[in-house]
Amino acid sequence: METYQEKIKQKLTVVPIEPGCYLMKDRNDQIIYVGKAKKLRNRLRSYFTGAHDAKTTRLVGEIRNFEFIVTSSETESLLLELNLIKQYQPRYNILLKDDKSYPFIKITKEKYPRLIVTRTVKKGSGKYFGPYPNAYSAQETKKLLDRIYPFRKCDKMPDKLCLYYHIGQCLGPCVYPVDLEKYAEMTKEITDFLNGEDKTILHNLEQKMQESSESLDFERAKEYRDLIQHIHNLNKKQKITSSDNTIRDVFGYSISKGWMCIQVFFIRQGNMIKRDATMIPLQQTEEEEFYTFIGQFYDLNQHILPKEVHVPKHLNKELIQSVVDTKIVQPLKGKKKDMVDLANHNAEVTLENKFELIAKDESRTVKAIEELGDVMGIQTPIRIEAFDNSNIQGVNPVSAMVSFIDGKPNKKGYRKYKIKTVDGPDDYKSMREVVRRRYTRVLNEGSPLPDLIIVDGGKGHMSGVIDVLENELGLDIPVAGLRKNDKHQTSEILYGEQAEVVPMKKNSQPFYLLQRIQDEVHRFAITFHRQTRQKTGLQSVLDTVDGIGAKRKTKLLRTFGSIKRMKEASVEDLKNSGLPQNVAENLHHALSNNS
């Protein structure tokens, strides 16, 4: 059986070298850590190579799987990381858990507006800009703006001048008359800056920096320089979030090799709180598949209709509107279009990864059977059939066969057998009977023969099977045996006239394949034996009671559901199910004596 380490190793090979977030999962598929990276592949690989500190070592020790989301920038990755941490509360993200909401910069709606940092958005109370990745970024931006623009600072208008007036960071509207046009001009410049319309402001700031430098006011020049640098660092386009509170779902899709991946971003309070990726085989045109999908997406009450649904611009808006009863938007530019493009890109990445993993899995399984054939000295075993017996002290003996083609389970070829000619717990004779029955029928029907037969057992099992094949059926098919250790795990494969151990590394793909085959045939046999045991156990109790035929047996099962519940029932309960008094008493007695 392939280990989780092998699965992670394979998955790492298809992670793109792009910015994004990753989610680490434990053995219970619970998200235990969320992180971000400028280059996802490099960061994820670093977790599984080299030495780490104690905390990271503990984290890596619990990782059994991971997911990732591609973004368009590092800033975007950070904001998404915070969203995911708020949503999933991973226990390894201690430092980020306390951040309850994103910070915004707000220009208040007052006669003399103020510039404040807030985490609460109240409609109609002012203009909001953000969200910012963290409080430090927002506070630093406000601090620089305060130094450049003498906005009012006090919450309530005082009756005297404050310190900010004396250091040149406030015009003092509490005492002196202030030109409202000048104040409005400052407000517009700040608004432009916070909206990212920075070309004019950058030009003005660079000019002011030059003037300050020429007048030897280097401190003021440094402040202008810092503000210019801050604009470059913090005023990046952030596609993963929006500053408005509109509830919207954003759809994107990609197609490849007859498959379609539809990606949905759920935007709430301006933040992407969740995404959904669905893979569907293309049965119609891509547009028709999309219309069908989006109609079912909301019609089946799986998702609540948002205020807006954003979709790619080339789709038929009217057709979508006919199946989705909310506002349909097809953004043509700006952040909203960027978000649709990002959904398309994530759908494309999801498809690429899926096909790469499938291709690698195909290559790995084909390589596994080729190597298995080489190490055993036989032709590549394209078709493998494996047998296992199951019984308890010879009671209800059964056998099962599983079929693997090209290293993958062929469940249509699975077979179940009840042992008919063997009395008592005789594994060897049971195996002979089943192999005889299986390949006699195969020969009669002209069905394809396997390239390799595997039995769960050692030399004795192999000898019996070979004898039946060669001396009774005239077949020459390689037969191998699989032995388990004291922990009931596959330990070695036996092959050849002397049933010798075939040298094979335990971490090789052929060995993993043999483990999968042995585990699967054992599971199949055990399940069949359990079903048989339950059925015969039911018959052995109910069939011994006079007055209970097929109809009453069926009615009892429908009423009580199981023998266990019948045992818990009183005579009166049994009678109420439709049995005569004497039959109910006899059944109650039989059930009480059946352990």
UniProtKB/Swiss-Prot annotation:
Interacts with UvrB in an incision complex. GO terms for molecular function: DNA binding; excinuclease ABC activity. InterPro entries: GIY-YIG_endonuc (IPR000305), GIY-YIG_endonuc_sf (IPR035901), GIY-YIG_UvrC_Cho (IPR047296), RuvA_2-like (IPR010994), UVR_dom (IPR001943), UVR_dom_sf (IPR036876), UvrABC_protein_C (IPR050066), UvrC (IPR004791). It is found in: Cytoplasm. Coiled coil: none annotated. Belongs to the UvrC family. This is UvrABC system protein C. GO terms for biological process: nucleotide-excision repair; SOS response. It comes from Staphylococcus saprophyticus subsp. saprophyticus (strain ATCC 15305 / DSM 20229 / NCIMB 8711 / NCTC 7292 / S-41). Pfam families: GIY-YIG, UVR, UvrC_RNaseH, UvrC_RNaseH_dom. Keywords: Cytoplasm, DNA damage, DNA excision, DNA repair, Excision nuclease, SOS response. Residues 199-234 form the UVR domain. PANTHER family: UVRABC SYSTEM PROTEIN C, UVRC/OXIDOREDUCTASE. One of its GO terms (cellular component) is excinuclease repair complex. PROSITE patterns: GIY_YIG, UVR, UVRC. The UvrABC repair system catalyzes the recognition and processing of DNA lesions. UvrC both incises the 5' and 3' sides of the lesion. The N-terminal half is responsible for the 3' incision and the C-terminal half is responsible for the 5' incision. Residues 17-94 form the GIY-YIG domain.
